[in-house]
Amino acid sequence: MEISILFLPLAASIISGFFGKYIGDRNSELVTSILVSISAILSIFVLYQVIFNQYEENIVIATWINSGSLDVNWSMLIDPLSAVMLVVVTSVSSLVHIYSIGYMSHDPHKPRFMAYLSLFTFAMLMLVTSDNFLQLFFGWEGVGLCSYFLIGFWFKKESANTAAIKAFVVNRVGDFGFALGIFLIFYLFGTVNYDEVFQQVPSMTAAGVTPFLDKELVFLGINFRAVDLICLLLFIGAMGKSAQILLHTWLPDAMEGPTPVSALIHAATMVTAGVFLVVRCSPIYEYSEPVSYTHLRAHETRG
């Protein structure tokens, strides 16, 4: 059932994207809306199980990378946080799909639009159910790519093309910081799996253990504790996706896309990805003292 939640939107995207011209506009709309709605219903059932039966599971779908010390599976992590996000993403997406049937009724490219919506949903689900930072990053980039497709859907409008490129480029700035944060995590912890990373953080602060959290690293000429630098780099990624100050300029222009796109990206899905990242990494953020951010602001003021 859990795997169906993830792959139903992908199946909807493939059917509408590759076979839309054969099955027709109406069938493309129905297939995508129905499959995503089924995914939403199953997500609600999973959330019920998590809340009332304390259900938690890490479902391994496939072995992804096994090279040296890097061992990464494509997994589906079900816990309270991911269960809530499953409901948020699929319920909002299903409503947007249904609304799009009427809103896009006069558009000649309806199957392509519905395929993009479903693919965006799949990428977002891949993001929120990841059990490691690498899968999270791939879902993160998938969401960014789909947002580019959706914002620039009306490609004959120059303003839509400009807005799509702007959103894509600005988000890549944040994603670069996010990628550096993942590289640093692997360098310091030797793994990108959530459980292994989160378990090591407190153990490395125990008496008699090398004070990992006090290890000084230099980034852009500024000395950071290792954990503070990790949190800063991850937060830069969150700033891009959640359109926070300095990396927020893409958001107003993104309104150039069809209204359902604005609802899907801005209301409750893509912009929550940054918040999700910070919450998911809270076991690391717990060991990053707020004073480090005060020092950072002081350096910015001096600059």
Q: Model regions: which residues?
A:
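...captures the hydrophobic TM-helix bundle architecture rather than a specific catalytic motif
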Residues: 1-297, 302
